[in-house]
Amino acid sequence: MKFNRYPIISSGAEHLVMGYLMRRNILTFKAPPNHQGYDLICIHPGAKENGAHLRIQVKSRLATDSPLAFPVRKESLDAFDYLVLVLLNVGNFYGRAKQNPAPRGACTPTIFTFPQSFVKRHFDGSSSWKKVCLHQLRLDRYRDDRGIERIARRLKIEYPTPASCVVGYRDFELQHTAPSAKPVRIRKPR
């Protein structure tokens, strides 16, 4: 079977994940190229507060009608903390391609964020194509922002709030102080 390789699109999946992570205030860096096991490194934006880091492996599927499965090397199962699957949904390439060819089958990308324990539990090493099958699994808690939130919680990153907003009492306002970025209540002048 012949496989198409699209390195720009694969790199785009990594950058898409970086964008989602940074949107949630998670400081994210690309790992060195061809680094086995993980593609991104995530740390707390206030590294002095929390020196923890997480290793993220990014897998992508190009076709909208691709099966919900992805290959993973057994040797790399311990090399990452989270695996992010990006369904790029570029268009139909398989069975539906005859009735609805690419790009007509294109739609918005979907992101799933799986912890290492989930990947290990659903890893199928018995087939020649070592993979994780997601068919018939309930995946809502790992999807899009809910999945990204798992990484933020693990790094103990609070949800971003406005720099100054009224919190219900007329005499207090919520302000962020640099560099800790933790909310502090300050009495408003009258």
What residue ranges belong to the model's regions?
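Mixed-charge (Asp/Glu-Lys/Arg
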Residues: 1-36, 41-190
